[in-house]
UniProtKB/Swiss-Prot annotation:
GO cellular component: cytosol
Highest classification ranks of the organism: Bacteria, Bacillati, Actinomycetota, Actinomycetes, Mycobacteriales
A single MF term (Gene Ontology): RNA binding
Compositional bias (Basic residues): 49-62
GO BP annotations listed: methylation; RNA processing
Entries under PANTHER family matching the protein: 23S RRNA (GUANOSINE-2'-O-)-METHYLTRANSFERASE RLMB
Residues bound to S-adenosyl-L-methionine: G262, V282, L291
Enzyme Commission identifier(s): 2.1.1.-
UniProt protein name: Uncharacterized tRNA/rRNA methyltransferase MMAR_5079
Enzyme class of the recorded protein, top EC level: transferase
The keyword Cell division belongs to this UniProt entry's keyword annotation: no
Keyword line: Methyltransferase, S-adenosyl-L-methionine, Transferase
Keyword Cytoplasm included in the entry's annotation: no
């Protein structure tokens, strides 16, 4: 091997002896020394293997629907780590100002054997497309969706069941906000269709403020069929639509309920609407015609929670 002076017969030319190597002394890594195993090459942002992996992810793959996601922000990251969400790497920006959340995140990641990598903030910006990462990001595998039957069974075990189903909701921020509202008002989970729907992406994780780590989300191959199955098991299917014929004031929230939320633009699809036992609306004052889907869902969930407290 060239330059190996220990090899028999090796001769080093005069003047080629290397001088003393000068490095950083480990200053950049000292803050995270002993905090966790070194990530593999494909997880290091500037490593050629990572660049190849990223390029490969951008290519369309036959049958592939979900990719590894990056959860951003101190609250969502900490919630994921507290909930034991499977994670592949924790990235921390160099020189970031630490607080209790960041310190706990690093500690939990180390205890769980999650690789921790300190990177320049500019690298973190590029990794997250300049989203508001607050100096920390957690790489997680695709979300593990629950089965609709399992979601319902768990809800029925702690009656009265309160579930939310989404129809024509394509914005992951709406999904994340609704997941957060379901958790806040004592709901048991969210049901989404497998096609033409927002999924639990990094954007949804962040909008949910980490609630997606503890609130199950199920995927149905056919939303209408899943709702009919739930109805057969004693769950009242209540649609939420601006054109609903029942005012929220007249809604009886004491029974096991699944609230089906339609999009602000399209509302409920025809088949889903026909599956509903009733369709409620939120009365509006003034010129405002409709509410954002996540806001409307929060209003209905708050009303049901109020009724169940009294």
């Amino acid at each position: 091997m060239a330059g190996n002076s220990q090899r028999r017969g090796a001769i080093r030319k005069s003047g080629t002896k290397k001088g003393t190597s000068v490095g950083s002394g480990g200053q950049r890594r000292r803050g995270l020394e002993g905090r966790g195993p070194t990530p593999p090459a494909h997880m290091r942002p500037n490593h050629p293997a990572a660049k190849r992996a990223k390029a490969q992810q951008r290519r369309p793959a036959r049958g592939r629907t979900d990719e590894t996601e990056t959860v951003l922000g101190r609250n969502p990251v900490l919630e994921c780590l507290r909930a034991g969400v499977p994670s592949t790497a924790l990235y921390v920006a160099l020189g970031v100002e630490a607080d209790e959340r960041l310190t706990e995140s690093v500690s939990r990641a180390a205890d769980s054997g999650i690789p921790i990598l300190e990177v320049p903030r500019t690298d973190l910006d590029r990794m997250t497309a300049n989203h508001l990462h607050q100096g920390i990001a957690l790489q997680v595998p695709p979300y593990n969706y629950a089965h609709p039957d399992d979601l319902l069974a768990a809800a029925l075990d702690t009656p009265p069941a309160l579930l939310v189903a989404l129809d024509n909701i394509s914005d992951p921020r709406n999904l994340g906000a609704i997941v957060r509202s379901v958790a806040a008002f004592g709901g048991h989970g969210v049901l989404i269709p497998q096609r033409r729907s927002a999924s639990v992406t990094a954007v949804a994780w962040r909008t949910s403020a980490g609630a997606a780590a503890r609130m199950p989300v199920a995927r149905a191959t056919n939303l209408t069929r899943a709702l009919k199955d739930w109805a057969d098991r004693g769950v009242r299917v209540v649609g939420l639509d601006a054109g609903g014929d029942t005012a929220i004031d007249d809604l009886d929230g004491s029974d096991p309920i699944v609230v089906v939320v339609g999009s602000e633009g399209k509302g409920l699809s025809r088949l889903v609407r026909q599956t509903c036992d009733e369709v409620v609306s939120v009365p509006m004052a003034g010129p405002t015609e409709s509410l954002n889907a996540s806001v409307a869902a929060g209003v209905v969930l708050a009303e049901i929670a109020r009724q169940r407290r009294t």
